[in-house]
Amino acid sequence: MVELTKSLDGLEKLIGLSFKDSHRLELALTHSSLKQGRDAANYERMEFLGDRVLGLAIAERLFVEFPTAPEGELSVRLNLLVSAETCAAIADELGLGRYIRHGGELTKLAAQRTRNIRADVV
């Protein structure tokens, strides 16, 4: 647990945020393949909420930055910015992959699937 705490401290420094509840940060990085008991918590519920928050934040920014753009153009821009490809690229740029907690079988998955997992934690 000490090693995980040090790792999370490093992540907080990397992203420039400090979490009051480090358990939430740990949960946000825990893939369902990490089996820690029958009803082990993972990031899926947080991902659901995070996707909506990210979408809303990006939509609001696009709305302000492109005041004359029609809805269709805003939608295209939004979808590009919140896509799995974009989120995975951000995760890769930040090196978030090394912080994701997962079961060993994850290394056997196809690149497309691991890209989605990296995108999930953004």
Task: Set out the residue ranges of the language-model regions.
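RNase III-family endoribonuclease catalytic core
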Residues: 1-122
